[in-house]
Amino acid sequence: MEFTKSLVKGKLIKRYKRFFTDVKLGKEVVTAHCPNTGSMKGLLDEGNDVYLLPNNDPKRKLKYGLEIIKTRKNLVGVNTHMANRIAQHALENNLIKELKNSDLIKPEVFFNKETRFDFLIEKNKQKSFVEVKNVTLFRNKDTAEFPDAVTSRGTKHLLTLIDAIKKGYKSYLLFLVQIQNMEKFKIAKDIDNEYYNNYLKAKKAGVNFLAYRCDISSKKIFIDKKLKIIDD
């Protein structure tokens, strides 16, 4: 996925009220929209390099959106709205080995009245649901982790993926690691032990878990490598 415009580099001052980020651009301080309402654990140190996407829409008050943060020498894609676009690009271009050559790729499909999964795919008449989780947490140099905060919604998705298997679907959960240089992935059970336990339950029930790393630059983000999932 290529960015629609060239990104502008600045220095992070602070993020506040979940949706706002103050950034120093040269001698000017601007407020950018933060398209990530999560904890963004480990990413928000003052002085970190950030990359903003300019916005010329007169209807929008904020003229920049936060896309990338550089921390501990790694670029991290923080726009959660990009995750599904990156995943769809990967599905359509056969970048995910386990999901190659699908006959149908349909985004945002309801499984029941309460739950909508990110994708429904079909291959050889077998239908599969795919849920995508954006990953931005890393606490050592080569291991990405999820979640970065307690996620009841994430736990609900795990249990619903199990329900989908019982109704004849295949279920996949794709951890989309928007962090440079990662080689492994694991569940952050110290952050959300309930999620970890339900992850193990879902794995035993037949949910397929995948972790893929993105190649990130100020011009584009795309899936480039499968990561090993570690179960502690």
Regions found by a protein language model. Name each.
Residues 10, 117-148, 161:
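Conserved catalytic cores of phosphodiester-cleaving nucleases, focusing on short active-site segments
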Residues 17-22:
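Short aromatic-glycine-enriched beta-strand elements
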Residues 38-51:
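Short nucleic-acid-contacting surface segments enriched for D/E, G, S/T with interspersed K/R
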Residues 41, 74-106:
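Acidic-basic catalytic patches of nuclease active cores, encompassing PD-(D/E)XK
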Residues 48-57, 213-214:
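Flexible glycine-rich surface loops and low-complexity tracts that mediate binding to linear polymers
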Residues 57-74, 224:
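OB-fold/S1-family single-stranded nucleic acid-binding modules
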Residues 142-152, 159-191, 213:
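Nucleic-acid nuclease catalytic cores
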Residues 178-232:
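Domain-level recognition of nuclease-like catalytic cores that cleave nucleotide substrates
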